[in-house]
């Protein structure tokens, strides 16, 4: 079966001070484009999966530059709506040693935030589609976008399209109360859910400490009780092992059983987009009929490799992911 993946969300301009400076020091900024669903689309395109990205961007040259950032990797940009005045921007102060990452959003009033239902022709967008992916960031952007996301889910389900959602709770975008109200409706249409402990706590108020079970398995089990339509819950988490090193592991929960990946110990160049790379790994695994253990290993390796790539996009191939996931290699020189 030939698959076509649709991802839907906001493509933003990311500005980061050079040389790990603070905002108060910065005189120059590195500019790249990214956004959860766009990052997933680029990953899938690099895996040679037919992928269409849907958003709304201004017609000016910055908007066109954002479109070009996707086109160069083979993402189908034919359904991107053009209009509005502003592109969403986020300022990123990168984590350095004990200093945490700091993000400031400037996206209120962006073309995507102000989009209306009439901007998106779902018959055209879903033409030939087999999978629809979005994140919880999209409905958090504005009330309009919450309504549009629900409409998109309904349209996808009407067409028998598989729906996946990365819950991706962002406290800077909406309150727990509002997230709970909207995502409780959205999740009724979701088949594959990607969620971690922060998402479960922030949106649904779960407390894994009350259970003797491993917390990610507990959260996945509780989510499937809340939403019996979930065929799978997947989770990836990063644990700090020292100031400079981290441990990465992930889990897939399906049919009442949890499957865990191997652990990767790593240094981080850029972790933005690592969760989106994981989503791409899950989607790629499922459309290629990987069993749960193979799927969790592949997806975890895809996320691990993203930590080695600067910018939002995970510029790696299926072969590279497979090699890390299953050949247990990566220290030797590739000749």
Q: Model segments located where?
A:
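Positively charged, low-complexity intrinsically disordered leader regions
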Residues: 1-22
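Short pre-catalytic strand/loop immediately N-terminal to key active-site residues, enriched for Gly-Thr
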Residues: 24-34, 221, 259-273
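Alpha-helix C-terminal capping segments
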Residues: 32, 40-50, 285-288
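Histidine-anchored nucleotide/phosphate-binding helix
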Residues: 36-46, 149-155
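Conserved N-terminal subdomain of the carbohydrate kinase-like
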Residues: 50-137, 321-335
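A short helix->loop->beta-strand "cap" motif at the edges of active sites that frequently abuts
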Residues: 155-162, 227-231
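Conserved phosphate/ATP/ADP-binding segment of small-molecule kinases
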Residues: 173-255
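Conserved post-catalytic alpha-helical subdomain immediately downstream of the catalytic base
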Residues: 262-328
């Amino acid at each position: 079966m030939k698959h076509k993946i649709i991802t839907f969300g906001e493509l933003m301009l990311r500005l980061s001070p050079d040389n790990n400076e603070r905002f108060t020091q910065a005189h120059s900024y590195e500019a790249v484009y990214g956004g959860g669903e766009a990052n997933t689309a680029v990953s899938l395109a690099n895996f040679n999966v037919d992928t269409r990205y849907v958003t709304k961007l201004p017609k000016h040259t910055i908007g066109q530059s954002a479109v070009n950032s996707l086109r160069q990797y083979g993402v189908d940009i034919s359904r991107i709506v053009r209009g509005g005045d502003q592109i969403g921007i986020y300022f990123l102060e990168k984590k350095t040693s004990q200093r945490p990452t700091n993000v400031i959003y400037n996206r209120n009033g962006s073309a995507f935030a102000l989009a209306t239902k009439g901007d998106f022709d779902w018959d055209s967008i879903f033409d030939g589609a087999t999978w629809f992916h979005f994140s919880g960031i999209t409905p958090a952007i504005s009330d309009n976008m919450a309504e549009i996301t629900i409409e998109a889910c309904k349209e996808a389900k009407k067409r028998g399209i598989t729906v996946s959602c990365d819950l991706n709770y962002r406290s800077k975008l909406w309150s727990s109360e509002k997230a709970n109200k909207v995502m409780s409706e959205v999740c009724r249409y979701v088949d594959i859910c990607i969620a971690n402990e922060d998402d479960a706590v922030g949106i649904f108020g779960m407390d894994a400490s009350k259970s003797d079970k491993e917390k990610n398995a507990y959260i996945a089990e509780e989510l499937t009780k809340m939403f019996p339509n979930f065929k799978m819950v997947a989770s990836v988490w990063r644990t700090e092992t020292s100031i400079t090193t981290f441990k990465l592991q992930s889990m897939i929960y399906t049919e009442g059983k949890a499957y865990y990946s191997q652990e990767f110990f790593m240094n981080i160049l850029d972790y933005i987009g690592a969760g989106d790379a994981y989503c791409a790994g899950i989607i790629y695994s499922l459309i290629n009929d990987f069993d749960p253990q193979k799927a969790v290993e592949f997806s975890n390796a895809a996320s691990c490799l993203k930590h080695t790539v600067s910018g939002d996009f995970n510029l790696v191939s299926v072969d590279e992911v497979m090699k890390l996931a299953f050949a247990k290699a990566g220290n030797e020189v590739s000749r």
